[in-house]
Amino acid sequence: KEILKSAVEKLNSEDVMPCLATVLVGDDPASATYVKNKHNACKKIGIKTMDHKLSADTTQKELDKIINNLNNDKEVHGILVQLPLPKQLNEFATVCRISPIKDVDGLTPQNVGLLSMGKSILKPCTPSGIMEMFYYYKINLEGKNVVMINRSNLIGKPLYHLLSQNNATVITCHSKTKNLNEHCKNAD
């Protein structure tokens, strides 16, 4: 937190006020809590936030317009569209609409591609936090067998790339994996 707070203060001294815009469609309690926690975390380190709460019956056109406006707003530095979206909305099209330089979740095709090539500018938060824990505790991943039970676009797939880039041998397991117990026994 202190490193982030210091970075925000440096940006402020250069007349840049970092701002995260969140977009929440619908009234899913877990999603609302997640977004609220993001706003609270930003507030603690001095990042301004914008909260866009949309009804569950929002159309793709309405959502696209909001994302376009946020992409074009020079005061907004990051955009987070809370997933999952209601069924009438296209998650892939929505993510693709976010400007890659404002994509804080690292889900746009451009950011996913850069991450897979080890050239990412923005890395997804949770996988980055997991890697920071390895660095903090000085855990060398080189040559280690890592079994990961997650293949989601937000956590599992990015974490796979980050672990591989640190020379770990990564086995990705999921709900259809057979002999999960055996895979886990072989993990370091």
Residue ranges of each PLM-predicted region?
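Glycine-rich phosphate/diphosphate-binding loop of Rossmann-like nucleotide-binding domains
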Residues: V25-N40, I121-D188
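Non-catalytic terminal and connector segments of soluble metabolic enzymes
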Residues: K44-G46, N69-N71, I98-I101, C184
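Short, well-structured alpha-helical segments in soluble
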Residues: E62-K74
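Short beta-strand segments enriched in small/hydrophobic residues
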Residues: M17-D27
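Glycine/small-residue-rich loop that forms an oxyanion/phosphate-binding "nest" at active or ligand-binding sites
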Residues: N72, Q82-S128
